[in-house]
């Protein structure tokens, strides 16, 4: 097969090396089909199904097609709002706490805890989905609730924090988070600043004398964003519009973030504004890197470690991953590429295939990502609205096709 994989051809797998115990086609050899073990590790299909739902439908389709197949469902995320769900599906305990939402109203947020490791998603507290009536508030949205989540996790015994930074509604540089930890942001008259990024332009003093001591916490930021805090590639310019910032709002937020960086530099005796990822989550990455001594790693890598993917994928017959759209972004550290790489390291020779709502990647691009075959819902149902509405049953159909291509025993060769 050559050239782009159109949606009409996505049911056909790309070429793959033949691992031990496989026929030359890449399918499970006849003697092993009955005991096939398939790891299912998809991200969410945005606007349609959660990662957990995607995994469940694929498992159901495989079980119907190949009775006796063993499946291990591992929903994943790339560091966004699915981080907590991925941890919960891996056996972490759910803890619900009341925190401040992005506009200050109380919301119930969850984090995941196992032993002294906690998985937190800032979107649980200050995400776009937490905005009342969905109304964007780019100038005043606050990350205060994310700080409250950190405190709650520390109080619950966490010492190692995985902090997913995707999906935030804020551009306050993480100033709300620092306020929740006991920092005081004061104006020229010594009064506390109003929340949000716009108010930061009036910042004159940062009082950290009452800040909670979280020095025992090891904070790992899960994010694919490597933007700096300021400038044309910074938090306001690049991500502000996604959070409702108008052309006139961008310089207001930029001015506020610049002032925040200046005052923080004086307080901490260090400049953190240009660190990789400082612009993540509206600048919350800056606050975590500067004030918490956090470090950053690509989101999917963090989540895969959180859910013990490597140990669970070792020796699998097949790995299935996926997300809503397989496109150029997939190749830049999104979940399917991350799963394929981790599977290759954990279980060399095990093929990885991907399912998606749509796919615009050609065979060569998929192969470079370590994906041996791609299957698109749009090949089964071209109507986008119907495809999203009926994504579950359609995924089960695709799973049957995957089983036919990769798990069905081959017919016995004719005798000589």
Feature-to-residue mapping (PLM):
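N-terminal loops that bind phosphate or other acidic moieties
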Residues: 2-11, 32-165, 169-416
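Long, intrinsically disordered low-complexity tandem-repeat segments
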Residues: 12-34
């Amino acid at each position: 097969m050559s050239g782009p994989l159109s949606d009409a051809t996505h049911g056909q797998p790309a070429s793959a090396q033949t691992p031990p115990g496989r026929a030359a086609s890449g399918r499970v050899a006849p003697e092993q089909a009955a005991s096939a073990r398939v790891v299912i590790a998809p991200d969410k299909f945005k606007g349609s199904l959660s990662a957990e739902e995607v995994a469940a439908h694929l498992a159901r389709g495989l079980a119907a097609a190949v009775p006796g197949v063993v499946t291990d469902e591992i929903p994943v995320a790339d560091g966004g709002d699915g981080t907590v769900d991925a941890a919960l599906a891996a056996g972490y305990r759910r803890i619900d706490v009341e925190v401040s939402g992005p506009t200050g109203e109380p919301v119930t947020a969850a984090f995941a805890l196992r032993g002294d490791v906690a998985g937190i998603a800032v979107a649980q507290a200050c995400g776009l989905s937490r905005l009342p009536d969905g109304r964007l508030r780019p100038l005043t949205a606050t990350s205060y609730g994310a700080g409250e989540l950190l405190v709650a996790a520390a109080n619950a015994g966490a010492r190692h924090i995985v902090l997913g930074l995707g999906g935030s509604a804020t551009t306050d540089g993480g100033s709300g988070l620092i306020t929740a930890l006991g920092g005081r942001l004061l104006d020229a008259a010594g009064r506390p600043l109003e929340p949000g990024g716009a108010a930061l332009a009036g910042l004159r003093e940062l009082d950290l004398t009452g800040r909670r001591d979280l020095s025992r916490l090891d904070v790992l930021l899960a994010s694919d964003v490597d933007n700096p805090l300021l400038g044309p590639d910074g938090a306001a310019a690049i991500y502000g519009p996604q959070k409702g910032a108008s052309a006139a709002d961008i310089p207001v937020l930029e001015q506020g973030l610049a002032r925040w960086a200046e005052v923080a530099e004086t307080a901490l005796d260090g400049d953190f504004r240009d660190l990789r990822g400082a612009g993540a989550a509206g600048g919350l990455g800056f606050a975590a890197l500067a004030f918490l001594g956090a470090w950053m790693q690509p989101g999917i890598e963090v989540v895969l470690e959180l859910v013990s993917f490597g140990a669970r994928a070792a020796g699998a017959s097949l790995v299935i991953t996926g997300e809503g759209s397989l496109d150029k972004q997939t190749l830049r550290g999104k979940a399917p590429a991350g799963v394929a790489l981790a599977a290759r390291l954990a279980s060399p020779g095990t093929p990885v295939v991907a399912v998606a709502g749509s796919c615009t990647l050609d065979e060569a691009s998929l192969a470079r990502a370590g994906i041996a075959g791609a299957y698109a819902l749009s090949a089964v149902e071209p109507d986008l609205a119907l495809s999203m509405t009926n994504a579950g049953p359609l995924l089960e159909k695709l799973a049957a096709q995957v089983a036919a291509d990769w798990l069905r025993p081959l017919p016995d060769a004719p005798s000589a």
